[in-house]
Design a protein with these regions (language model features):
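Short, conserved structural patches
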Residues: 2-3, 44, 52-147
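Catalytic tyrosine of NAD(P)H-dependent dehydrogenase/reductases that use a Tyr as the general acid/base
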Residues: 15, 32, 40
Length: 147
């Protein structure tokens, strides 16, 4: 009887199952994190381009702030950003230095609250509703010389 127990104890049956059970959640979390951060970077690129498009409209003579905001939100919509109306657009007039002189310019800043689809609920579950699950604000600024 003792020899049978010894063989069962030394047997490696089920070791692969335990190793997979320990490593699979970590690999799954790593894969989901890569996908989520890739998605966040794609949204950041769209927000940056929307700020640039807004600056292009803002430098034209006779445009209003509503024209700039409409163009930024239209670009966010075309970039398939969820809820583009949640983005805040700030337009300011400024001066920039060009060589030895200065020129009038328009500065457009776009702030967009980005929520992770998978990681945010997991963070809320693990951390018990702490600030880990709050949306990340993606900001982009574009400044262009007025025409």
């Amino acid at each position: 009887m003792s020899q049978w127990l010894y063989r069962r104890w030394r047997s490696e049956d089920g070791a692969a199952l335990i190793e997979a059970a320990l490593t699979l959640p970590l690999l799954l979390l790593l894969s989901v994190s890569i996908i989520e951060f890739g998605r966040a970077y794609q949204v950041y690129q769209v927000v940056t381009n929307a700020a640039r498009e807004g600056a292009r409209v803002a430098v034209l003579p006779g445009t209003s702030t509503s024209d700039v905001t409409t163009r930024v939100q239209a670009y966010l919509q075309a970039g398939q950003i969820s809820n583009p109306s949640s983005a805040t657009v700030q337009i300011t007039s400024t001066t920039i230095s060009i060589g030895a002189g200065t020129a009038a310019a328009s500065r457009v800043e776009v702030d967009y609250p980005f929520s992770f689809m998978v990681l945010q609920p997991v963070a809320n579950l693990v951390a018990g509703g702490s600030t880990l699950g709050t949306p990340l604000t993606l900001s982009a600024v574009a400044t262009m010389r007025n025409e």
